[in-house]
Curated annotation (Swiss-Prot):
Its main location: secreted. This is Ascaphin-8. Expressed by the skin glands. Keywords: Amidation, Amphibian defense peptide, Antibiotic, Antimicrobial, Cytolysis, Hemolysis, Secreted.
Length: 19
């Protein structure tokens, strides 16, 4: 669903920012 896609994008963004 859209929520899952948003979750994935948020995770990737956090990973990029932190690491």
């Amino acid at each position: 669903g859209f929520k899952d896609l948003l979750k994935g994008a948020a995770k990737a963004l956090v990973k990029t920012v932190l690491f």
